[in-house]
Amino acid sequence: MITLAALQMKSESGDVAANLARIGQAAKEAAGKGASLLITPELGLTGYGAGDVIRDLAEPADGPLVRRLQAISAETGVAIIAGFAEKAGADTFNSAVYVDGPAEPVVYRKSHLYGDYERTLFTTAEPSTMLFTHRGVKCGMLICYDVEFPENVRRLALADVDAVLVPTALPAGYSGTFIADHMIQTRAFENQVFVAYINHCGGDERFTFAGSSRIAAPDGSLLASAPSHGEALMVVPLNPADFLVSKSENTYLTDLTRRA
């Protein structure tokens, strides 16, 4: 079992220092509430709508920004998932990093870029299964649009993860409302995993965000939800053992791979 903190955040566009400070503040608050892992939104460190400046702010996965996240994690005792622009040679990836103090970071690169805005800024990564175990709970990461493809969540479920953790930048509108209110719980139920889907709130010079962050359980129930407006820090326990009955009743993964 772990206690997860999830920050629905108003990022400052192009202001990495301010966003890093906000994440540090949230990590301290999460520690005070007994959480051991904090998840934050897609590109939360640069701001999602910062445009071309995002490429200028990109850093390698072993750069000073990730090292600062590691320091915050070590200071607070809280592991952190943060979205950043990752520089790798000539490529810039839309990435999320998991840091747990001085341990080796785990980096996931977004494999399904959404729209011309993202495709202009970032290189498309190959679909990948980047896993880590946090305090005994096996986790995988996706980013925003990735979770809208059931194949991506199913791939992680077949790798036996307990939780799928999804930094996102979901725009406001009908589609955003549908995704938050229906798709996230469905992804959790059909794969019998926790799904944490953590969004921005407010807006920037290009986008208005839906807020509406969600944490869903393997039985499809909603463990926590954030409002459509304003920041929120949700703190919830994730205990796979609480949902063994659901897994025994809903044997999708077993039956999918069953041989006649």
What are these regions (language model features)?
Residues 1-6:
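Extreme N-terminal starter segment of soluble prokaryotic enzymes
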Residues 8-13:
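Short polar catalytic/cofactor-binding loops
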Residues 16, 24-107, 171-186, 190-193:
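Cys-nucleophile CN-hydrolase/nitrilase-fold catalytic domain and related Cys-dependent amidase chemistry
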Residues 18-27, 147-154:
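Short, acidic/polar
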Residues 36-37, 139, 163:
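Structural motif
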Residues 61, 87-159, 172-182, 239, ...:
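Active-site catalytic loop in hydrolytic enzyme cores
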Residues 64-79, 148-232:
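CN hydrolase (nitrilase-like) catalytic-core segments centered on the catalytic cysteine
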Residues 82-84, 95-98, 130, 197, ...:
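Short beta-strand scaffold segments in enzyme catalytic cores
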